[in-house]
C-alpha cells in the first residue's frame, strides 16, 4: 500500500459475493454481536463501484435473512485520500455515513509526506492533493485519526509533522515505525531527540488536552496484563480475511 511493491490484483464481484454468502450462510459460526467489513490491501476507493456493489449486497442480504448483524455492522476503510472528494466516493459516503469508519493516511508536513508518498508516473509528491481533502474528511468523520509511518530518512521531521497534523485539526495521530531493516547508525539518538522535543512542545502548549499521539500512550513501558500478554494483535487468529483470489 505504501511502497507499492506488491503485484496488482483485483477482486472480482463473483469472489466477493461468494465470500459474503459463505459468511452469512454460516451465521452459527459467526456469533459476534457486530461485524466490521474492512476493505484493505490497496487503495480501496479506486474500486468504489465494486465496493458500493459489495456493500449494497451485504445490506440487502442482512435484511432479507433477518440476520443478527442487520443494523449492527460497519464498513471500514483506510485511504490515501487522493480521490476522497470525487462524486462517486462522496455519494457512497453519504449513503452509508452512519455505518462508516474512514481514516486518511497523511504523514505530516509536505516535506515528510512527499518523501514516500509520490505518484509513480511522475515522481511528484501527493501531499497537496491529500491535504485539500482533510477539511471535508474531518467534517464528515471528526473523531477519526490518521496513521503515520516513519523510517530512517524522515526521523528529523517527527516533531514538526505531529504538530502540523494537530494544526490541521487531526486530534489523534497514530504512528508506526517501518518494521523492515531500514535503520542507520545513530537513528536511535535522533529518534529520542525528536520525541523529547515533541513532548516538550505538547506539554508547554497544553496540546495534550485535546490531542493524542500513540508514541506517548500511557501503556508504553509498563507491564502488560496477563490477558494482553497472551493475545494476538492486528486481528491475527481472530479476523477472517479474504484475498483477491478468494483464499
PLM feature spans:
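Canonical Radical SAM [4Fe-4S] cluster-binding loop centered on the CxxxCxxC motif
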Residues: 1-14
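Extended hydrophobic/Leu-rich segments
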Residues: 1-3, 138, 207, 243
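Radical SAM/AdoMet-radical enzyme domain recognition
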Residues: 13-40, 47-178
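A short acidic, helix-capping loop that chelates divalent metal ions and anchors anionic groups
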Residues: 6, 111-117, 183-185
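A C-terminal junction/extension of Radical SAM enzymes
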Residues: 184-247
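Short acidic (Asp/Glu) and glycine-rich catalytic loops that position anionic groups and cofactors
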Residues: 177-180, 247
Amino acid at each position: 500500500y505504501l511502497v507499492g511493491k506488491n503485484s496488482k490484483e483485483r477482486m472480482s464481484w463473483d469472489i466477493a459475493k461468494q465470500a459474503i454468502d459463505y459468511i452469512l450462510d454460516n451465521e452459527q459460526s459467526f456469533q459476534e454481536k457486530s461485524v466490521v467489513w474492512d476493505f484493505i490491501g490497496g487503495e480501496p476507493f479506486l474500486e468504489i463501484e465494486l465496493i458500493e456493489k459489495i456493500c449494497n449486497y451485504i445490506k440487502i442480504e442482512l435484511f432479507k435473512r433477518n440476520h443478527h448483524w442487520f443494523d449492527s455492522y460497519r464498513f471500514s476503510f483506510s485511504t490515501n485520500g487522493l480521490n476522497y472528494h470525487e462524486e462517486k466516493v462522496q455519494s457512497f459516503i453519504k449513503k452509508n455515513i452512519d455505518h462508516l469508519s474512514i481514516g486518511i493516511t497523511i504523514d505530516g508536513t509536505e516535506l515528510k509526506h512527499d518523501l514516500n508518498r509520490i505518484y509513480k508516473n511522475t515522481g511528484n509528491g501527493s501531499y497537496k492533493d491529500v491535504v485539500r481533502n482533510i477539511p471535508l474528511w474531518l467534517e464528515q468523520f471528526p473523531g477519526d485519526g490518521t496513521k503515520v509511518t516513519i523510517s530512517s530518512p524522515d526521523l528529523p521531521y517527527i516533531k514538526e509533522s505531529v504538530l502540523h497534523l494537530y494544526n490541521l485539526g487531526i486530534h489523534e495521530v497514530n504512528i508506526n515505525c517501518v518494521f523492515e531493516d531500514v535503520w542507520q547508525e545513530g537513528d536511535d539518538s535522533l529518534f529520542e531527540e525528536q520525541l523529547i522535543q515533541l513532548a516538550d512542545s505538547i506539554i508547554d502548549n497544553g496540546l495534550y488536552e485535546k490531542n493524542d499521539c500513540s508514541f506517548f500512550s500511557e501503556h508504553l513501558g509498563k507491564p502488560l496484563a496477563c490477558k494482553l500478554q497472551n493475545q494476538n494483535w492486528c486481528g491475527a487468529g481472530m479476523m477472517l480475511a479474504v484475498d483477491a483470489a478468494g483464499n
